[in-house]
C-alpha cells in the first residue's frame, strides 16, 4: 500500500500541487510544482528520494543522478502510462516538461496547417531520439501519433527498442530505426514511398567535447553562487529549482557534433530539400538565438516556402523551434 509522501528528516512540506506561474504550453500537463503524492503512487520507489527544499516544499536532490532518473520514471508512469523506462549509465536524462512543450507546439503547427494526410493520424519522424525515446513517448501517448524514431548510436537504438517492446501502448505506435551513416540525417531513413507529417529534432548543441566541459563548469559555478546567495548563513543546500536539472549526463553524439548546432541544422536544411514532397513540416530546436538569422537566410536560399519560429520559455531557459516547409 502506498501512503502519501512525507519527505525524510523533515515535517510535512507545503503541498506541491499549487500551480505556479508557468510559461509552459497550456496543454502541457507539467504545470506548477510536481505533485509528489501522485508521482509516488505511480512509482513507489520515488519515495526514498523525496526531500524538502528550504521553503518546505517536496522535491528531490537534482544533483543526484539516480533521484533524477527515478523522478523521470515516475513522471512517465503517471502522465503517459509508461510501465518500464530506463537508461544506460551516462546517457541523456531529458527534462520532461520542456520536451513535452515541443510536442504540444508542433501539435498546434499541424492543427493550424494542412497536415498532408487528412483523416489519418500524423506520422512523425524523430531525428536523434536517444536512449530515452522521449518525443515518441510523449507524442504517441498525448495524441496517438505514429512515430519513426532514429539515432546513430546502437546503444540508444537497442534501449529505445526495449522500451517499445515492454510497453504495449508504445509498441503499436513507435518504430525504431538506426541511421547507419552518421553523415546523413534523412537519407537512409526516409524511403521512396514514405511520407511524414512532421519531423522533430533536439540537435547536438556543442561543437566539441571541450565545449561541453567548459559549459558544465560555468553552469556548476553559477549554481554554487546562486546557492550561496540563497543561504547567507552558510547552511548546506543541495537543492536546485525543480525542473532545472543539473545532472542530465549525455553521450558524445547527444551533446556535440563538429561545427556545433549551426552546422548540424544547416546539414539538415540542405538535406531536407531532397525530401520536400515527402515531409509536410521540418522542425528542429534551436538553442542559440544567434543561429536563427543565418539559418533563416539558408532556408530562403534553398527555397523554403514557409518559415516559422516558435519561441519557448522554461523558467530561465529560452529556446525556440525552427519550422519550414516547401509547399
Curated annotation (Swiss-Prot):
This is Ribosomal RNA large subunit methyltransferase F. Specifically methylates the adenine in position 1618 of 23S rRNA. Residues 1-31 are annotated as: Disordered. Belongs to the methyltransferase superfamily. METTL16/RlmF family. NCBIfam families: PRK11727.1 (NF008725). The keyword ATP-binding does not apply. It holds the Pfam family Methyltransf_10. PANTHER family: RNA N6-ADENOSINE-METHYLTRANSFERASE METTL16 (PTHR13393:SF0), SAM-DEPENDENT METHYLTRANSFERASE (PTHR13393). The keyword Acyltransferase does not apply. Its EC number is 2.1.1.181. GO terms for biological process: rRNA base methylation. It catalyses: adenosine(1618) in 23S rRNA + S-adenosyl-L-methionine = N(6)-methyladenosine(1618) in 23S rRNA + S-adenosyl-L-homocysteine + H(+). It comes from Psychrobacter sp. (strain PRwf-1). One of its GO terms (molecular function) is 23S rRNA (adenine(1618)-N(6))-methyltransferase activity. Its main location: cytoplasm. One of its GO terms (cellular component) is cytoplasm. InterPro entries: METTL16/RlmF, rRNA_lsu_MeTfrase_F, SAM-dependent_MTases_sf. It is found in: Cytoplasm. Keywords: Cytoplasm, Methyltransferase, rRNA processing, S-adenosyl-L-methionine, Transferase.
Amino acid at each position: 500500500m502506498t501512503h502519501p509522501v512525507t519527505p525524510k528528516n523533515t515535517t510535512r512540506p507545503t503541498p506541491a500541487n499549487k500551480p505556479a506561474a508557468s510559461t509552459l504550453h497550456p496543454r502541457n500537463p507539467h504545470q506548477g510544482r510536481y505533485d509528489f503524492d501522485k508521482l509516488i503512487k505511480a512509482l513507489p520507489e520515488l519515495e526514498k528520494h523525496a526531500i524538502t527544499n528550504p521553503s518546505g516544499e517536496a522535491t528531490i536532490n537534482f544533483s543526484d543522478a539516480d533521484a533524477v532518473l527515478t523522478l523521470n520514471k515516475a513522471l512517465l508512469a503517471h502522465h503517459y502510462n509508461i510501465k518500464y523506462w530506463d537508461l544506460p549509465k551516462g546517457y541523456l536524462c531529458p527534462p520532461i516538461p520542456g520536451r513535452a512543450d515541443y510536442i504540444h507546439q508542433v501539435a498546434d503547427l499541424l492543427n493550424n496547417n494542412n497536415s498532408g494526410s487528412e483523416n489519418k493520424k500524423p506520422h512523425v519522424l524523430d531525428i536523434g531520439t536517444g536512449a530515452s525515446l522521449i518525443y515518441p513517448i510523449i507524442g504517441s501517448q498525448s495524441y496517438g501519433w505514429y512515430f519513426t524514431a532514429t539515432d546513430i548510436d546502437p546503444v540508444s537504438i537497442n534501449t529505445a527498442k526495449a522500451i517499445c517492446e515492454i510497453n504495449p501502448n508504445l509498441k503499436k505506435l513507435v518504430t525504431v530505426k538506426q541511421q547507419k551513416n552518421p553523415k546523413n540525417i534523412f537519407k537512409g531513413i526516409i524511403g521512396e514511398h514514405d511520407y511524414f507529417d512532421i519531423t522533430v529534432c533536439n540537435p547536438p548543441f556543442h561543437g566539441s567535447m571541450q565545449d561541453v566541459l567548459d559549459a558544465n563548469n560555468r553552469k556548476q559555478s553559477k549554481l554554487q553562487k546562486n546557492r550561496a546567495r540563497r543561504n547567507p548563513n552558510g547552511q548546506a543546500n543541495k537543492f536546485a529549482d525543480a525542473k532545472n536539472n543539473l545532472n542530465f549526463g549525455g553521450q558524445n553524439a547527444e551533446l556535440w557534433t563538429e561545427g556545433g548546432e549551426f552546422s548540424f541544422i544547416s546539414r539538415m536544411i540542405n538535406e531536407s530539400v531532397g525530401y520536400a514532397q515527402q515531409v509536410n513540416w521540418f522542425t528542429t530546436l534551436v538553442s542559440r538565438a544567434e543561429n536563427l538569422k543565418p539559418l533563416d537566410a539558408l532556408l530562403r536560399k534553398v527555397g523554403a516556402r514557409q518559415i516559422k519560429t516558435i519561441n519557448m520559455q522554461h523558467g530561465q531557459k529560452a529556446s525556440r523551434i525552427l519550422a519550414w516547409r516547401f509547399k
